[in-house]
Protein backbone atom coordinates (compact mmCIF):
# COMPACT_ATOMS: atom_id res chain seq x y z
CA UNK A 1 0.00 0.00 0.00
CA UNK A 2 2.87 2.34 0.83
CA UNK A 3 4.32 1.77 -2.60
CA UNK A 4 0.92 2.54 -4.08
CA UNK A 5 0.69 5.83 -2.19
CA UNK A 6 4.19 6.79 -3.26
CA UNK A 7 3.31 5.98 -6.84
CA UNK A 8 0.18 8.18 -6.63
CA UNK A 9 2.25 11.00 -5.15
CA UNK A 10 4.78 10.78 -7.98
CA UNK A 11 1.99 10.85 -10.55
CA UNK A 12 0.43 13.89 -8.86
CA UNK A 13 3.76 15.71 -8.92
CA UNK A 14 4.20 14.90 -12.61
CA UNK A 15 0.70 16.17 -13.33
CA UNK A 16 1.33 19.40 -11.44
CA UNK A 17 4.66 19.84 -13.24
CA UNK A 18 2.96 19.29 -16.61
CA UNK A 19 0.21 21.81 -15.81
CA UNK A 20 2.76 24.41 -14.66
CA UNK A 21 4.85 23.85 -17.80
CA UNK A 22 1.76 24.41 -19.96
CA UNK A 23 0.90 27.58 -18.07
CA UNK A 24 4.43 28.91 -18.48
CA UNK A 25 4.31 28.13 -22.19
CA UNK A 26 1.00 29.96 -22.57
CA UNK A 27 2.24 32.93 -20.57
CA UNK A 28 5.37 33.11 -22.70
CA UNK A 29 3.22 33.08 -25.81
CA UNK A 30 1.03 35.85 -24.44
CA UNK A 31 4.12 37.88 -23.57
CA UNK A 32 5.42 37.54 -27.09
CA UNK A 33 2.02 38.58 -28.45
CA UNK A 34 1.85 41.58 -26.14
CA UNK A 35 5.41 42.51 -27.03
CA UNK A 36 4.18 43.27 -30.55
CA UNK A 37 2.13 46.01 -28.95
CA UNK A 38 -0.65 48.00 -30.55
CA UNK A 39 -0.51 48.84 -34.25
CA UNK A 40 1.76 51.75 -35.17
CA UNK A 41 -0.26 54.76 -36.34
CA UNK A 42 0.64 56.59 -39.54
CA UNK A 43 -1.10 59.93 -40.08
CA UNK A 44 -1.79 60.74 -43.74
CA UNK A 45 -2.76 64.09 -45.20
CA UNK A 46 -4.23 63.93 -48.69
CA UNK A 47 -5.70 66.23 -51.32
CA UNK A 48 -7.21 63.21 -53.11
CA UNK A 49 -10.52 61.52 -52.45
CA UNK A 50 -10.37 60.22 -48.87
CA UNK A 51 -12.32 57.08 -49.71
CA UNK A 52 -9.78 56.11 -52.36
CA UNK A 53 -6.78 56.80 -50.10
CA UNK A 54 -8.44 54.89 -47.23
CA UNK A 55 -8.97 51.90 -49.53
CA UNK A 56 -5.32 51.97 -50.61
CA UNK A 57 -3.98 52.27 -47.06
CA UNK A 58 -6.46 49.72 -45.75
CA UNK A 59 -5.52 47.09 -48.30
CA UNK A 60 -1.84 47.52 -47.48
CA UNK A 61 -2.57 47.21 -43.75
CA UNK A 62 -4.49 43.97 -44.36
CA UNK A 63 -1.49 42.49 -46.15
CA UNK A 64 0.77 42.84 -43.11
CA UNK A 65 1.48 40.06 -40.59
CA UNK A 66 -0.17 40.31 -37.18
CA UNK A 67 2.98 41.47 -35.40
CA UNK A 68 3.61 44.31 -37.89
CA UNK A 69 0.19 45.89 -38.10
CA UNK A 70 -0.14 49.57 -39.06
CA UNK A 71 -3.17 51.79 -38.50
CA UNK A 72 -3.70 54.72 -40.85
CA UNK A 73 -5.45 57.95 -39.88
CA UNK A 74 -6.38 59.93 -43.00
CA UNK A 75 -7.28 63.61 -43.16
CA UNK A 76 -7.99 66.08 -45.94
CA UNK A 77 -8.08 69.07 -43.60
CA UNK A 78 -5.30 71.50 -44.46
CA UNK A 79 -4.86 72.61 -40.86
CA UNK A 80 -3.89 69.02 -39.96
CA UNK A 81 -1.14 68.78 -42.58
CA UNK A 82 1.69 69.69 -40.23
CA UNK A 83 0.69 66.92 -37.81
CA UNK A 84 0.78 64.27 -40.54
CA UNK A 85 3.55 61.76 -41.16
CA UNK A 86 3.17 61.81 -44.92
CA UNK A 87 1.36 63.58 -47.76
CA UNK A 88 -0.39 61.86 -50.66
CA UNK A 89 -1.18 64.51 -53.24
CA UNK A 90 -0.47 65.99 -56.66
CA UNK A 91 3.20 66.58 -57.41
CA UNK A 92 2.82 70.37 -57.30
CA UNK A 93 2.15 70.38 -53.55
CA UNK A 94 4.86 67.80 -52.91
CA UNK A 95 7.41 69.89 -54.78
CA UNK A 96 6.40 72.99 -52.82
CA UNK A 97 6.96 71.12 -49.57
CA UNK A 98 10.30 69.78 -50.77
CA UNK A 99 11.53 73.26 -51.69
CA UNK A 100 10.36 74.55 -48.30
CA UNK A 101 12.45 71.88 -46.56
CA UNK A 102 9.38 70.15 -45.09
CA UNK A 103 10.15 66.68 -46.46
CA UNK A 104 12.85 64.11 -45.73
CA UNK A 105 14.60 61.81 -48.18
CA UNK A 106 12.79 58.58 -49.04
CA UNK A 107 14.92 55.42 -49.09
CA UNK A 108 12.45 53.12 -50.87
CA UNK A 109 13.76 50.15 -52.84
CA UNK A 110 11.26 50.31 -55.68
CA UNK A 111 11.52 54.08 -56.04
CA UNK A 112 14.93 53.34 -57.58
CA UNK A 113 13.10 51.91 -60.61
CA UNK A 114 11.48 55.26 -61.38
CA UNK A 115 13.02 57.68 -63.90
CA UNK A 116 14.13 61.09 -62.66
CA UNK A 117 11.01 62.75 -64.12
CA UNK A 118 8.81 60.81 -61.69
CA UNK A 119 10.45 61.84 -58.43
CA UNK A 120 12.12 64.73 -56.69
CA UNK A 121 15.79 65.19 -57.58
CA UNK A 122 16.63 64.71 -53.89
CA UNK A 123 14.10 61.84 -53.65
CA UNK A 124 12.00 63.72 -51.10
CA UNK A 125 8.85 62.61 -52.90
CA UNK A 126 8.06 59.89 -55.45
CA UNK A 127 5.21 59.35 -57.90
CA UNK A 128 2.82 56.47 -57.17
CA UNK A 129 0.36 56.87 -60.05
CA UNK A 130 -0.74 59.36 -62.69
CA UNK A 131 -3.89 60.73 -64.31
CA UNK A 132 -3.67 61.22 -68.10
CA UNK A 133 -5.62 63.71 -70.18
CA UNK A 134 -7.77 61.79 -72.66
CA UNK A 135 -10.10 62.26 -75.59
CA UNK A 136 -13.55 60.91 -74.80
CA UNK A 137 -15.06 60.09 -78.18
CA UNK A 138 -18.77 59.56 -78.76
CA UNK A 139 -19.33 56.08 -80.25
CA UNK A 140 -21.82 57.24 -82.89
CA UNK A 141 -19.44 59.97 -84.06
CA UNK A 142 -16.56 57.48 -84.20
CA UNK A 143 -18.59 55.12 -86.38
CA UNK A 144 -19.41 57.98 -88.72
CA UNK A 145 -15.85 59.21 -89.28
CA UNK A 146 -13.93 55.98 -88.61
CA UNK A 147 -12.00 55.18 -85.46
CA UNK A 148 -8.65 55.26 -87.29
CA UNK A 149 -9.20 58.93 -88.09
CA UNK A 150 -8.71 59.90 -84.47
CA UNK A 151 -5.59 58.46 -82.85
CA UNK A 152 -3.40 61.50 -82.15
CA UNK A 153 -3.72 65.03 -80.83
CA UNK A 154 -2.82 66.20 -84.33
CA UNK A 155 -5.89 64.41 -85.73
CA UNK A 156 -8.34 66.57 -83.78
CA UNK A 157 -8.08 69.78 -85.88
CA UNK A 158 -8.83 67.69 -88.97
CA UNK A 159 -12.28 66.78 -87.62
CA UNK A 160 -13.74 70.04 -88.93
CA UNK A 161 -17.36 69.19 -88.14
CA UNK A 162 -16.68 67.80 -84.66
CA UNK A 163 -18.26 69.44 -81.64
CA UNK A 164 -15.70 69.64 -78.85
CA UNK A 165 -16.19 70.36 -75.16
CA UNK A 166 -13.53 70.83 -72.49
CA UNK A 167 -13.04 72.44 -69.11
CA UNK A 168 -12.05 76.07 -68.81
CA UNK A 169 -8.25 75.88 -68.62
CA UNK A 170 -7.83 78.76 -66.17
CA UNK A 171 -10.27 77.42 -63.57
CA UNK A 172 -8.20 75.15 -61.34
CA UNK A 173 -4.85 73.49 -60.70
CA UNK A 174 -5.62 70.42 -62.83
CA UNK A 175 -6.63 72.36 -65.94
CA UNK A 176 -3.75 74.81 -65.64
CA UNK A 177 -1.33 71.88 -65.36
CA UNK A 178 -2.85 70.41 -68.54
CA UNK A 179 -2.04 73.65 -70.33
CA UNK A 180 1.44 73.83 -68.77
CA UNK A 181 2.28 70.23 -69.70
CA UNK A 182 1.09 70.66 -73.28
CA UNK A 183 3.03 73.92 -73.60
CA UNK A 184 6.14 72.34 -72.08
CA UNK A 185 6.04 69.53 -74.64
CA UNK A 186 4.97 71.48 -77.75
CA UNK A 187 6.40 74.89 -76.93
CA UNK A 188 4.09 77.70 -75.85
CA UNK A 189 3.66 79.27 -79.29
CA UNK A 190 2.95 75.89 -80.90
CA UNK A 191 0.52 74.96 -78.12
CA UNK A 192 -1.40 78.22 -78.49
CA UNK A 193 -1.48 77.73 -82.27
CA UNK A 194 -2.92 74.23 -81.77
CA UNK A 195 -5.60 75.43 -79.36
CA UNK A 196 -6.40 78.30 -81.73
CA UNK A 197 -6.96 75.73 -84.50
CA UNK A 198 -9.56 73.81 -82.53
CA UNK A 199 -11.16 76.92 -80.97
CA UNK A 200 -13.93 77.19 -83.64
CA UNK A 201 -14.92 73.58 -82.87
CA UNK A 202 -15.32 74.11 -79.13
CA UNK A 203 -18.96 74.43 -78.16
CA UNK A 204 -18.42 74.90 -74.45
CA UNK A 205 -15.71 75.58 -71.90
CA UNK A 206 -17.23 73.78 -68.94
CA UNK A 207 -17.07 74.88 -65.33
CA UNK A 208 -17.40 71.37 -63.88
CA UNK A 209 -15.39 68.21 -64.80
CA UNK A 210 -18.56 66.14 -65.23
CA UNK A 211 -19.96 68.37 -67.99
CA UNK A 212 -17.62 67.27 -70.83
CA UNK A 213 -18.16 63.62 -69.86
CA UNK A 214 -21.94 64.01 -69.84
CA UNK A 215 -22.04 65.87 -73.15
CA UNK A 216 -19.88 63.30 -74.97
CA UNK A 217 -21.99 60.47 -73.55
CA UNK A 218 -25.33 62.00 -74.51
CA UNK A 219 -24.20 63.06 -77.98
CA UNK A 220 -24.35 66.78 -77.23
CA UNK A 221 -20.64 66.77 -78.10
CA UNK A 222 -18.58 64.49 -80.32
CA UNK A 223 -15.27 64.79 -78.48
CA UNK A 224 -14.54 65.75 -74.88
CA UNK A 225 -11.05 66.71 -73.73
CA UNK A 226 -10.95 65.54 -70.12
CA UNK A 227 -9.10 63.43 -67.55
CA UNK A 228 -9.24 59.66 -67.26
CA UNK A 229 -10.20 60.02 -63.60
CA UNK A 230 -13.25 62.10 -64.55
CA UNK A 231 -14.52 59.39 -66.92
CA UNK A 232 -13.55 56.08 -65.37
CA UNK A 233 -16.11 56.03 -62.57
CA UNK A 234 -18.93 56.18 -65.13
CA UNK A 235 -17.63 53.57 -67.57
CA UNK A 236 -19.86 50.55 -68.16
CA UNK A 237 -20.09 48.00 -70.97
CA UNK A 238 -22.78 50.00 -72.74
CA UNK A 239 -21.22 53.44 -72.19
CA UNK A 240 -21.83 55.42 -75.41
CA UNK A 241 -18.30 56.88 -75.60
CA UNK A 242 -14.77 55.51 -75.36
CA UNK A 243 -11.49 56.74 -73.90
CA UNK A 244 -8.61 57.48 -76.25
CA UNK A 245 -5.12 58.17 -74.94
CA UNK A 246 -3.24 59.68 -77.91
CA UNK A 247 -0.45 57.37 -79.06
CA UNK A 248 2.30 60.00 -78.98
CA UNK A 249 1.60 60.89 -75.36
CA UNK A 250 -0.58 63.20 -73.34
CA UNK A 251 -0.45 65.73 -70.47
CA UNK A 252 -0.52 63.95 -67.13
CA UNK A 253 -1.04 64.90 -63.51
CA UNK A 254 1.40 63.08 -61.24
CA UNK A 255 0.29 61.93 -57.78
CA UNK A 256 2.78 60.79 -55.21
CA UNK A 257 3.85 60.68 -51.60
CA UNK A 258 6.21 62.67 -49.41
CA UNK A 259 7.46 61.94 -45.89
CA UNK A 260 7.31 64.95 -43.60
CA UNK A 261 10.53 66.04 -41.92
CA UNK A 262 9.34 65.54 -38.34
CA UNK A 263 7.86 62.06 -38.87
CA UNK A 264 9.21 59.07 -36.96
CA UNK A 265 7.28 56.64 -39.15
CA UNK A 266 9.91 56.26 -41.87
CA UNK A 267 9.93 52.46 -41.79
CA UNK A 268 6.16 52.12 -42.01
CA UNK A 269 5.77 54.78 -44.72
CA UNK A 270 8.54 53.35 -46.88
CA UNK A 271 7.00 49.87 -46.62
CA UNK A 272 3.73 51.40 -47.86
CA UNK A 273 5.51 53.15 -50.75
CA UNK A 274 7.22 49.94 -51.87
CA UNK A 275 3.91 48.07 -51.67
CA UNK A 276 2.14 50.70 -53.79
CA UNK A 277 4.84 50.49 -56.45
CA UNK A 278 5.41 46.73 -56.62
CA UNK A 279 2.16 45.05 -55.56
CA UNK A 280 -0.40 43.70 -58.02
CA UNK A 281 -2.98 44.27 -55.28
CA UNK A 282 -2.28 48.01 -55.39
CA UNK A 283 -2.65 48.06 -59.17
CA UNK A 284 -5.90 46.11 -58.96
CA UNK A 285 -7.21 48.57 -56.40
CA UNK A 286 -6.66 51.45 -58.83
CA UNK A 287 -9.15 49.63 -61.08
CA UNK A 288 -11.69 48.40 -58.53
CA UNK A 289 -12.04 51.81 -56.89
CA UNK A 290 -12.65 53.32 -60.36
CA UNK A 291 -10.04 55.96 -59.62
CA UNK A 292 -8.96 56.24 -63.25
CA UNK A 293 -5.33 56.51 -62.15
CA UNK A 294 -2.61 54.46 -63.83
CA UNK A 295 0.43 52.92 -62.07
CA UNK A 296 3.94 54.19 -62.80
CA UNK A 297 5.21 50.60 -62.55
CA UNK A 298 2.61 48.80 -64.72
CA UNK A 299 4.15 45.37 -63.98
CA UNK A 300 5.34 46.12 -60.47
CA UNK A 301 8.60 44.51 -59.47
CA UNK A 302 8.63 42.43 -62.67
CA UNK A 303 8.95 45.22 -65.19
CA UNK A 304 10.11 48.68 -66.07
CA UNK A 305 8.48 52.01 -65.33
CA UNK A 306 5.98 53.51 -67.74
CA UNK A 307 7.55 55.06 -70.85
CA UNK A 308 8.35 58.59 -69.71
CA UNK A 309 8.24 59.88 -73.30
CA UNK A 310 4.44 59.52 -73.37
CA UNK A 311 3.99 61.32 -70.04
CA UNK A 312 3.86 65.04 -70.74
CA UNK A 313 4.56 66.97 -67.56
CA UNK A 314 5.05 70.59 -66.64
CA UNK A 315 8.80 71.05 -66.98
CA UNK A 316 8.89 74.79 -67.72
CA UNK A 317 6.31 76.74 -65.69
CA UNK A 318 7.71 76.09 -62.24
CA UNK A 319 6.64 79.20 -60.34
CA UNK A 320 3.06 80.06 -59.48
CA UNK A 321 3.47 83.36 -61.30
CA UNK A 322 4.59 81.61 -64.51
CA UNK A 323 1.67 79.17 -64.34
CA UNK A 324 -0.88 81.93 -63.80
CA UNK A 325 0.64 84.02 -66.60
CA UNK A 326 0.30 81.08 -69.01
CA UNK A 327 -3.36 80.68 -68.04
CA UNK A 328 -3.89 84.43 -68.54
CA UNK A 329 -2.28 84.23 -72.00
CA UNK A 330 -4.61 81.36 -72.94
CA UNK A 331 -7.61 83.27 -71.61
CA UNK A 332 -6.76 86.34 -73.64
CA UNK A 333 -5.60 84.68 -76.86
CA UNK A 334 -7.90 81.65 -77.07
CA UNK A 335 -10.74 81.53 -74.56
CA UNK A 336 -12.12 85.00 -75.20
CA UNK A 337 -11.82 84.78 -78.98
CA UNK A 338 -15.26 84.88 -80.59
CA UNK A 339 -15.85 81.41 -81.99
CA UNK A 340 -19.56 80.91 -81.39
CA UNK A 341 -19.21 79.20 -78.02
CA UNK A 342 -22.39 78.31 -76.19
CA UNK A 343 -23.01 80.75 -73.37
CA UNK A 344 -23.10 78.73 -70.15
Residue map of PLM features:
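Early extracytoplasmic/lumenal segment of secretory-pathway proteins
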Residues: 30-99
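Short, low-complexity disordered leader/linker segments with a strong preference
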Residues: 1-41
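A bilobed periplasmic-binding-protein/Venus flytrap-type ligand-binding module shared by bacterial periplasmic
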Residues: 136-141, 253-265, 285-286
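Extracytoplasmic ligand-binding site segments that recognize negatively charged/polar headgroups
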Residues: 39, 47-48, 79-84, 90-213, ...
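A beta-strand-loop signature enriched in Asp, Gly, Thr, and Trp
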Residues: 229-258
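Mature extracytoplasmic/periplasmic domains
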Residues: 260-318
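A ligand-binding cleft/hinge motif common to bilobed small-molecule-binding domains
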Residues: 92-99, 217-240
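Extracellular/periplasmic bilobal clamshell ligand-binding domains
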Residues: 300-344
Amino acid sequence: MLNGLQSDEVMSRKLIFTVLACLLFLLAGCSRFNAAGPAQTVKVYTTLDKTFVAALCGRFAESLPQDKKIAFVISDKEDELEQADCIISESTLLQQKAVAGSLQKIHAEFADLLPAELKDKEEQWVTLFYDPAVLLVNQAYSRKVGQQQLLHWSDVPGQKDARIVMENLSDNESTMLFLAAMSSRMGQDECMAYLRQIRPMIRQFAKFPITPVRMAATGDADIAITRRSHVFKYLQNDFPAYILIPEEGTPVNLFGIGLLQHSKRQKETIAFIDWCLRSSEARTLLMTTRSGYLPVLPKGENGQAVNRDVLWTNTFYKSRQALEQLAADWLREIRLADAGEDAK
